[in-house]
């Protein structure tokens, strides 16, 4: 594979127009933010309610297993990011290894357009977080924002307006001040991390008695701390039951360190070398320690029963954050925890907006997507890509809020990303076979094959349990439509390029410009 920068006949232009604004800290922040630790900690109860059984579901062990399954992907992204530090990094090496048709169609389905329903999901997660925080602080008027749209008392219109307004504001920031967009993510991540630390310390200081007093103080008929703890009689760990939660960790956390590689041409210094392994380690601790704290303070039996109790989860938004706020002895502490929860979730949204525009830019550079999507303003922002993302995502927020009412209605669409990551692993293995020697070759091939196997398994889990993972018409229809759209678009663009006298496939044999 050549490494020269080809002329304008191959790529749309000779430079992306983006600048190197992303430090190592920024890269870690955007990776961990995109790994959705805030959502993973706050939405677990809704998934526990959907499981066929919660007997033996251990979230700490589940997080450990999921992190272990992510190790091959970590190796792949670390090694390949050093070789392809470009905009849309994993798309670049996958399309160069597996060919333009496979690379273009799978990326359009699995990342470029899949990110939009994911952002819609996260936008609604932010709304639910704001509503739950308001309730925990004593503002009962915010109940409508905290409840899923299919639950009596919910306010789908308010959820749509708030979620869409927040999304519009973040898109405008990235259009007008793209450098500020990266700095906001780092700020949100830092504030969110502080909130998680405060929550953990608050729970540890409150102890078992604090949890008992909080639950009993809710005055829920027939529901006390003791009754919840006694209602669970199963083991503390069952492998089969815990493995049912693997798609949950895949939905929100461990696969998503493609964030920093997607802005590869904007990374400064050593950011492209170390951001992936550091991000995986940081995300593991941020997710696992809170779950472990809940088990330690509240007890495994109580925590499992509470996270699968419909009244606590649906009506009181029970999760790690609300429990910590509930046991807090002062308003300031509760507010700090609530703020951390909200901004940690907003950070996911903030970077999702950036990453989708980078994949659009990369694919338009290869002449697969329309050239207008590659337009970069004088401020260094891919404006048209942002506006397209804005239009589609706002529509999906509305569909999820009004027609389906639950976050899980969009879960199924994330299956497309599992397919994408499987092909990314396969692409790395093919690249290793063709271009590497010795230890590097063996490492890339083995890690790539293992990554492909892990995500094939996760795709199967999504399909095998549609009732848990949002196997709705909206989700599956979106995945199928985007795949066929990609296939048709590739055929059309190739036909147009052939008539114009240049071969579109040449782009997939060269490394694109920075």
Label the model's feature ranges.
Residues 142-153, 157, 186-334:
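Helix-loop-helix junctions that connect adjacent transmembrane segments
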Residues 46-47, 71-79, 83-167, 345-359, ...:
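Hydrophobic transmembrane alpha-helices that form the core helical bundles
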Residues 14-21, 89, 176-187, 255-291, ...:
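Hydrophobic, small-residue-rich membrane helices and short re-entrant helix-turn-helix hairpins
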Residues 1-60, 64, 70-75, 220-224, ...:
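Membrane-interface "cap" regions at the ends of multi-pass membrane proteins
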Residues 92-95, 99-100, 137, 141, ...:
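TM-loop-TM module centered on a large, flexible mid-protein loop between adjacent transmembrane helices
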Residues 47-63, 138, 144-156, 178-188, ...:
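Transmembrane helix-loop boundary segments of multi-pass membrane transporters
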Residues 44, 61, 193-194, 199-207, ...:
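A generic transmembrane alpha-helix motif of multi-pass inner-membrane proteins
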Residues 22, 158-222, 255, 279-284, ...:
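Membrane-interface loop-to-helix entry segments
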């Amino acid at each position: 594979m050549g490494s020269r920068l080809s002329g304008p006949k191959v790529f749309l232009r000779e430079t992306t127009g983006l600048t190197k604004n992303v430090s190592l800290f920024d890269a870690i922040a955007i990776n961990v933010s995109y790994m959705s630790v805030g959502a993973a900690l706050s939405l677990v109860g809704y998934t526990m309610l959907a499981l066929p059984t919660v007997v033996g579901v251990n979230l700490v062990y589940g997080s450990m297993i999921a992190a272990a399954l992510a190790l091959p992907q970590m190796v792949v992204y670390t090694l390949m990011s050093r070789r392809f530090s470009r905009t849309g990094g994993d798309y670049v090496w996958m399309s160069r290894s597996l060919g333009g048709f496979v690379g273009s169609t799978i990326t359009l389905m699995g990342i470029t357009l899949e990110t939009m329903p994911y952002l819609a999901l996260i936008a609604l997660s932010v709304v639910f977080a704001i509503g739950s925080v308001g309730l925990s602080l004593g503002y009962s008027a915010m109940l409508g924002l905290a409840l899923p749209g299919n639950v009596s008392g919910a306010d789908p219109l308010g959820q749509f307006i708030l979620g869409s307004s927040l999304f519009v504001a973040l898109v405008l920031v990235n259009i007008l001040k793209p450098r500020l967009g990266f700095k906001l993510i780092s700020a949100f991540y830092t504030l969110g991390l502080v909130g998680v630390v405060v929550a953990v310390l608050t729970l540890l200081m409150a102890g078992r008695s604090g949890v008992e007093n909080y639950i009993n103080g809710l005055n829920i008929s027939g529901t006390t701390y003791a009754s919840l703890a006694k209602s669970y009689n199963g083991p503390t760990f069952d492998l089969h039951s815990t493995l049912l939660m693997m798609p949950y960790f895949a939905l929100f956390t461990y696969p998503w360190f493609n964030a920093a590689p997607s802005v590869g041409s904007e990374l400064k210094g050593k950011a492209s070398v170390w951001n992936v392994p550091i991000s995986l380690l940081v995300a593991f601790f941020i997710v696992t320690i809170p779950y472990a704290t809940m088990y330690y303070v509240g007890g495994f039996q109580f925590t499992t029963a509470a996270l699968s109790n419909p009244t606590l989860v649906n009506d009181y938004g029970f999760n790690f954050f609300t429990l910590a706020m509930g046991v807090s002895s002062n308003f300031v502490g509760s507010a700090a925890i609530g703020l951390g929860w909200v901004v940690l979730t907003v950070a996911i949204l903030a970077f999702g907006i950036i990453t989708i525009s980078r994949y659009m830019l990369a694919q338009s550079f290869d002449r697969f997507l329309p050239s207008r999507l590659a337009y970069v303003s004088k401020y260094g922002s891919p404006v048209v890509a942002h506006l397209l993302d804005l239009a589609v995502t706002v529509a999906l927020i509305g569909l999820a809020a009004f027609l389906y009412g639950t976050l899980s209605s969009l879960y199924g669409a994330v299956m497309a990303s599992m397919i994408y990551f499987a092909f990314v692993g396969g692409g790395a293995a093919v690249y290793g076979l063709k271009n590497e020697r010795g230890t590097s070759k063996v490492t890339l091939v083995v890690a790539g094959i293992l990554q492909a196997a892990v995500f094939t398994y996760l795709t199967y889990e999504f399909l095998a349990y549609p009732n848990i993972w949002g196997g709705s018409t909206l989700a599956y229809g979106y995945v199928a439509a985007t795949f066929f759209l990609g296939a048709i678009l590739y055929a059309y663009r190739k036909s147009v390029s052939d008539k114009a006298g240049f071969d579109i496939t040449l782009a997939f044999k060269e490394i694109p410009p920075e």
